[in-house]
From Swiss-Prot:
GO terms for biological process: apoptotic process; myo-inositol transport. It is a multi-pass membrane protein. Pfam families: SSF (PF00474). It comes from the Eukaryota. One of its GO terms (molecular function) is myo-inositol transmembrane transporter activity. This is Sodium/myo-inositol cotransporter 2. The gene is SLC5A11. It comes from Oryctolagus cuniculus (Rabbit). Residues 1-27, 78-102, 162-180, 230-272, 330-375, 440-446, 501-521 are extracellular. Expressed in brain, lung and kidney. In the kidney, strongly expressed in the cortex, at the luminal side of proximal convoluted tubules and in BBMVs. Weaker expression observed in the medulla (at protein level).
Length: 674
């Protein structure tokens, strides 16, 4: 106990006030303002530079991104403010085990580029629900999946990131939580609505650089404050809150805090769950989530997509060092606030009786860093928040527009699709803000645990349907649909039980049903996956096999099938959705109106544009990327939606060797920290 109190700790007027009289000074605010201006400048530059007046240009950045902005965007989209707050908070509460998610992600992001992406490119798909529609036929799977993705985005991504970023800004500027959220969204929504995916990727590249510089700086200050890694390992176990009851184990650091692999029955992250149960949601996130896949599809070719995945995989080594370890340092320096164990005390400290570990990272920034660097770290947190939100907004609007709206209105003009996509972003924002109070009260005050629990209940069935669709040619629509429905039904039941039977505080008896109390969410992930695979297999074998058109170019074994040339269909005759599942480059599904503005629709809507328009109308058209469209403009020639899967042999070999090195690096980290 003496070691923890002897650590450098700023004087506090009230030991339970987490941020006493501590707010940003003029120098910090100047850095933050400069950051906002810089991001807006980059966002507006990319808005002007890139082609935003087509659906492909808006949703796929024109398909001409090189490897480094793709890799930076993959990392920035993954590491949002929820990561900074959540990983540091879980590190403070339970140790390094949460870093297993990051090391696991190294394998999954490589699987995306080397295994799944060639299938998506060969099948000429641009959204994940569209892949299932082409692979299995029909529309019920794609619609179910589109609705599920939007649900997951709202309840585990957007609201979590907004809450995490708002915690930081609320504590540093002493603003109301919701006012903080609205202020952040104003800038975020502006360049997402205006610029599309290109603006998102370019600003992500900038924000990745800012995140890394700021986070590495704070890591240096953190380790210096406790005497390096040796000091951290020694003092962490002495970081106890002063008001803890001597007869209680509440508030004690875990004995296995510095181990990734933990007891299979009694620990917070059992090792079988880490090895198997964790890999399944990770596979869903990196290989089938629209937010991530959309960035890789925007690459100019498969080699650039692989380069982006390699860059993201190497960057995934860093969160343990720049987030988890600093969170543990925060517990050492500020045990009474970060490690509070009494609900009344926690309520007083952070307005959350479940626990205050989520203030670990903001606490470090505001108490440890000098003026100027505090402003830089504020910029880092805002960068993390904005990069995640813009990515999710763009991908969610892509799914809604291309998979749901296009199903309802298959003949919708390109102009209509562009407007619908942008309006949906605004609707997403509203729903997500309303969900924040539920996030605030969930999972014992550990934000990252909340995210992973919901992921383990909803994502495994989807992941298994994708895996079977990609690697088992016999899987058919009936098997995939009923496997998905049964898996999601079980997942939603467990999710509802978790919200009804909230985990009790440390000193209270646990009277929850055994299925909630004794079945860890990672084990439940394994159960869901097994049920889904069994259902898909049995139903597929009992029903008719899929046609050749549903397999060609859409599985790993058929991705290189020869393309069957078909007669050109006149542009004025749109293909109905029923003819859209042959899987070739010429297969125009309802959602692939990315290639041309249909001549008939163009003429029908040309009368809407009057020769003279007010300045307000012209400004709105520019914001939506639809300015200056001539009514006499000839239809654009058809262009391939996605790149080829062919690669330069030398570049391919170089990438493969680099991939093996990255895998060896991941295995070393697993072994060293296991």
């Amino acid at each position: 106990m003496e070691s923890s109190t002897s650590s450098p700790q700023p004087p506090l007027s009230d030991p339970l006030d987490p941020f006493p009289q501590r707010s940003l000074e003029p120098g910090d605010i100047a850095v933050l303002v400069l950051y906002f201006l810089f991001v807006l400048a980059v966002g507006l530059w990319s808005t002007v530079k890139t082609k935003r007046d087509t659906v492909k240009g808006y949703f796929l950045a024109g398909g001409d991104m090189v490897w480094w902005p793709v890799g930076a965007s993959l990392f920035a989209s993954n590491v949002g403010s929820g990561h900074f707050v959540g990983l540091a908070g879980s590190g403070a509460a339970t140790g390094i085990s949460v870093a297993a998610y990051e090391f696991n992600g190294m394998f999954s992001v490589l699987m995306l580029a080397w295994i799944f992406l060639p299938i998506y490119i060969a099948g000429q798909v641009t959204t994940m629900p569209e892949y299932l529609r082409r692979r299995f036929g029909g529309s019920r799977i794609a619609i179910t999946l589109a609705v599920l993705y939007l649900f997951i985005y709202i309840f585990t991504k957007i609201s979590v990131d907004m809450y995490a970023g708002a915690i930081f800004i609320q504590q540093s500027l002493h603003l109301d939580l919701y006012l903080s959220v609205v202020g952040l969204l104003a800038v975020t929504a502006l360049y997402t609505v205006a610029g599309g995916l290109a603006a998102v990727i370019y600003t992500d590249a900038l924000q990745t650089l800012i995140m890394l510089v700021g986070a590495l700086t704070l890591m240096g200050y953190s380790f210096a404050a406790v005497g390096g890694m040796e000091g951290l390992q020694e003092k962490y176990f002495l970081a106890l809150p002063s008001n803890r009851s001597e007869n209680s184990s509440c508030g004690l650091p875990r004995e296995d805090a510095f181990h990734l692999f933990r007891d299979p029955l009694t620990s917070d992250l059992p090792w079988p769950g880490i090895l198997f149960g964790m890999s399944i949601p990770s596979l869903w996130y990196w290989c089938t989530d629209q937010v991530i896949v959309q960035r890789s599809l925007a690459a100019k070719n498969l080699s650039h997509a692989k380069g982006g995945s390699l860059m993201a995989a190497y960057l995934k080594v860093l969160p343990l060092f720049i987030m988890v370890f600093p969170g543990m340092v925060s517990r050492i320096l500020f045990p009474d606030q970060v490690a509070c164990a009494d609900p009344e005390t926690c309520q007083r400290v952070c307005n959350n009786p479940s626990g205050c570990s989520d203030i670990a990272y903001p606490k470090l920034v505001l108490e440890l860093l000098p003026t100027g660097l505090r402003g830089l770290m504020m910029a880092v947190m805002v960068a993390a928040l904005m990069s995640s939100l813009t990515s999710i907004f763009n991908s969610a609007s892509t799914i809604f527009t291309m998979d749901l709206w296009n199903h309802v209105r298959p003949r919708a003009s390109e102009k209509e699709l562009m407007i619908v996509g942008r309006v949906f972003v605004l609707l997403l924002v509203l729903v997500s803000v309303l969900w924040i109070p539920v996030v605030q009260a969930s999972q014992g005050g550990q934000l990252f645990v909340y995210i992973q629990a919901i992921s383990s209940y909803l994502q495994p069935p989807v992941a298994m349907v994708f895996v079977l669709g990609c690697f088992w040619k016999r899987a058919n629509e009936k098997g995939a649909f009923w496997g998905l429905v049964l898996g999601l039904l079980l997942g939603f039941i467990r999710l509802i039980l978790d919200f009804i039977y909230v985990e009790p505080a440390c000193h209270q008896p646990d009277e929850r049903p055994s299925v909630v109390k004794n079945v860890h969410y990672l084990y439940f992930s394994m159960i869901l996956s097994s049920v889904t695979v069994l259902t898909v297999t049995v139903m597929s074998l009992l029903t008719e096999p899929p046609s050749k058109e549903m397999i060609s170019h859409l599985t790993w074994f058929t991705r290189r099938d020869p393309v069957v040339q078909k007669a050109q269909v006149p542009a004025a005759t749109p293909l109905p959705p029923a003819l859209s599942h042959n899987g070739t480059a010429e297969a125009n599904s309802a959602s692939i109106q990315l290639e041309t503005i249909q001549e008939g629709a163009s003429k029908a809507h040309s009368s809407d544009v009057t020769p003279k328009q007010s300045r307000v109308v012209r400004a709105l058209l520019w914001l939506c990327g639809m300015e200056g469209k001539s009514t006499e403009q000839a239809p654009r020639p058809a262009e391939p939606v996605l790149a080829s899967i062919e690669e330069n042999p030398v570049v391919k070999t170089l990438l493969d060797v680099n991939c093996l090195l990255c895998i060896c690096c991941a295995f070393f980290l697993w072994g060293y920290f296991a």
